[in-house]
Structure formats: structure tokens, C-alpha cells
Amino acid sequence: MMRTLITIHPLPLLLLLQQLLQPVQFQEVDTDYDLPEDKREEFEEYVEQFFSTGPTRPPTKEKVKRLLLIEPGMPLYHVDYCNSEIMRKNVYYKHRCVAEHYFLLMQYDELQKICYNRFVPCKNGVRKCNRSKGLVEGVYCNLTEAFRIPACKYESFYRKGYVLITCAWQNEMQKLIPHTINDLVEPPEHRSFLSEDGVFVISP
């Protein structure tokens, strides 16, 4: 059982283990773990975010691709889509579950172009978002149980609509890049839901 957990969720479990073992007054974080090269940078980012008391790192292209974009595979309307992908992609903030999250079925270049579209009102008090010109398929994840990793449980909602994003200037790339997904707004003719029998339907 423990081997299975470590294989599926290596980064969150390493963070929790380190927090339990180190003395409270210990200030420096040892990140010299025997991790594959493609996971080392990701783990160091989690360590910095986990112990930092300041603002989070600015977005990067690789971070956006890793956390927000998905490839065809598991059906987007699968009831456990969010639970599976959030664990697989290690979508957390410090040691807590995120309250909501979006996964988009699109390429990064398509998402990045939205940063140059016109501004529209956002939700949750955000003043300006950029809206996609076409409909985008994705999944909205809403936290339903627990608040600390790795016990996060989510309800999954398939959506096909206009994606609203915020963007930030990236100095190294000298261009705007996607920062957060604010919403995925379905037009009335594309409202989708699960029936009482758990069957995915699209209203006419």
C-alpha cells in the first residue's frame, strides 16, 4: 500500500514527510533527493511554494502546460476525472487542496493567443479577463471533501464553452503568457450535465 502511494503521489508525500521529520527551527530545506531529472525542478518548485511565506512564483510556460492543459485520454465527463488528474499533476497550494481548478483540452499556443483577445468581465471580483473566440472543451473541478493533501476530493463537471483567462508579462520570453483560468462559460445551447442516472447528456 505504501509503495503504491509513493508511486502515485511522490511529490506531496515527500513534502509531508519532510515537514514531519525536520525540527521547527530548521530554516534550510534539503532538496537533494534521488529524483529523475524531469521531476527535480518540479519538486524544488513544490518545496519553495510549500515553505514560502511570500508571493508565489510568476507563471512559466512549462508550469501552465503541466497544471492546466490535458491530452485526449480519459473521457472528460468521467465522474473521477478531477480526482485522477489533480493527483497525477500534483495540483496543490502549499499543503492544502485548491478550492477549484480547470483543465483545458487545447494546445499551449492556442491558449497563449487568448492573452491578446479583448477584455471581458471575470468572476470572483477579478476586473479583466481575456476570452477565447471559440469554444473550448475542458473540466471544472470543485473541492467537496478535505482541505489538506493528499485527501482532496473533487466533483468533476465537463464543460464546452468560452474560456476566460488572466495573463501576466513574462520578462524572459518578452510576451504575455497565461496565468490563471478564471472560468469556462458555456453558452445556453451547450449546457451539459449528468442526469440522475449518472448519464452524460447535452441539452438540445
UniProtKB/Swiss-Prot annotation:
<feature type="signal peptide">
    <location>
        <begin position="1"/>
        <end position="26"/>
    </location>
</feature>
<feature type="glycosylation site" description="N-linked (GlcNAc...) asparagine">
    <location>
        <position position="130"/>
    </location>
</feature>
<keyword id="KW-0964">Secreted</keyword>
<dbReference type="GO" id="GO:0003676">
    <property type="term" value="F:nucleic acid binding"/>
</dbReference>
<feature type="glycosylation site" description="N-linked (GlcNAc...) asparagine">
    <location>
        <position position="142"/>
    </location>
</feature>
<dbReference type="Pfam" id="PF00074">
    <property type="entry name" value="RnaseA"/>
</dbReference>
<dbReference type="InterPro" id="IPR023412">
    <property type="entry name" value="RNaseA_domain"/>
</dbReference>
<keyword id="KW-1015">Disulfide bond</keyword>
<dbReference type="InterPro" id="IPR036816">
    <property type="entry name" value="RNaseA-like_dom_sf"/>
</dbReference>
<dbReference type="GO" id="GO:0005576">
    <property type="term" value="C:extracellular region"/>
</dbReference>
<feature type="disulfide bond">
    <location>
        <begin position="97"/>
        <end position="152"/>
    </location>
</feature>
<feature type="disulfide bond">
    <location>
        <begin position="122"/>
        <end position="129"/>
    </location>
</feature>
<dbReference type="InterPro" id="IPR001427">
    <property type="entry name" value="RNaseA"/>
</dbReference>
<comment type="similarity">
    <text>Belongs to the pancreatic ribonuclease family.</text>
</comment>
<protein>
    <recommendedName>
        <fullName>Inactive ribonuclease-like protein 9</fullName>
    </recommendedName>
</protein>
<keyword id="KW-0732">Signal</keyword>
<keyword id="KW-0325">Glycoprotein</keyword>
<dbReference type="GO" id="GO:0050830">
    <property type="term" value="P:defense response to Gram-positive bacterium"/>
</dbReference>
<comment type="function">
    <text>Does not exhibit any ribonuclease activity.</text>
</comment>
<feature type="disulfide bond">
    <location>
        <begin position="115"/>
        <end position="167"/>
    </location>
</feature>
